[in-house]
């Protein structure tokens, strides 16, 4: 009887070890290039994905245009989240994307943002940028950052660009533009709503949402790249974005998602 019980426990222990080993053996690591407006929310999405699948997601954040150039040059990313749809579509046309993997996951928004100690009256909207006290206005570099292009478009549509262009300072991406304001190196910034919606940032400053009529829609796309074709996890991570709880999380961070 004792021998039978001992053998049973050994069998159970062996099965548990095997299950853990097999899961570890199957686990994959994917490398993700992501636009920096996703800096907070994508980390949460990746954590949920890792918990459910046992796979690992390593994310590099930066500007969409820089990642586009790197991927064209052979950078070993498996998934690319862009802050627009043009860069993923261009990669698709170049044959660098897994067929059918493109997904327009959200649309972003831009806001005026200042630190709490700022005396600027944000209720005035973009016209507050005309104040003489505003010496530096941070935006993402419009040459390779979609949020930077949206900021310029908003300034042009409100006839403010010529007035303030000499005071613009550029971050390499939207996260760096945010940091310029957060560290006091700029007085105000035109940045992504998704960054100021992060719990860690909500108490550090104030924001004014810029009318979406003042800039083109910031439609954002993701693709699984051909370099990740041997990793089923790459495509699975893209599909994970379509789940209702992930869509709800994106909306919580200020994104618009055209899904029911």
Task: Outline where the language-model segments fall.
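N-terminal secretory signal peptides that target proteins for export/translocation
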Residues: 1-7
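Short linear sequence motif anchored by a di-proline
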Residues: 8-10, 26
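Bacterial N-terminal signal peptides
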Residues: 10-21
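Exported/periplasmic ABC-transporter solute-binding proteins
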Residues: 27-54, 58-61, 65, 69-75, ...
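Bacterial Sec-dependent signal peptides at the C-terminal "C-region" and cleavage site
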Residues: 21-27
């Amino acid at each position: 009887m004792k021998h039978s019980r001992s053998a049973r426990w050994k069998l159970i222990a062996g099965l548990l070890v095997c299950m853990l080993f097999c899961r570890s053996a199957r686990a994959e690591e994917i490398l993700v290039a992501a636009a920096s407006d996703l800096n907070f929310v994508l980390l949460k999405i990746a954590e949920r994905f890792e918990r459910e699948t046992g796979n690992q997601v390593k994310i590099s954040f930066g500007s969409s245009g820089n990642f586009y150039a790197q991927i064209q040059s052979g950078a070993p990313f498996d998934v690319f989240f862009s802050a627009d749809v043009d860069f993923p579509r261009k990669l698709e046309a170049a044959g660098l994307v897994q067929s059918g993997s493109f997904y327009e996951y959200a649309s972003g928004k831009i806001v005026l943002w200042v630190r709490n100690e700022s005396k600027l009256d944000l209720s005035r909207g973009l016209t507050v940028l005309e104040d003489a006290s505003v010496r530096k206005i941070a935006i993402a570099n419009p040459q390779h950052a979609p949020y930077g292009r949206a900021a310029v478009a908003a300034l042009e549509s409100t006839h403010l660009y010529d007035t303030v262009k000499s005071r613009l300072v550029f971050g390499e991406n939207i996260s760096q533009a945010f940091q310029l304001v957060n560290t006091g190196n700029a007085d105000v910034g035109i940045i992504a709503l998704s960054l100021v919606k992060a719990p860690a940032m909500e108490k550090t400053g104030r924001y004014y949402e810029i009318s979406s009529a003042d800039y083109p829609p910031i439609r954002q796309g993701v693709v699984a790249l051909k370099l990740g074709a041997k990793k089923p996890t790459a495509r699975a991570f893209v599909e994970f974005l379509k789940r209702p709880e992930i869509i709800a999380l994106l909306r919580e961070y200020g994104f618009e998602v055209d899904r029911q």
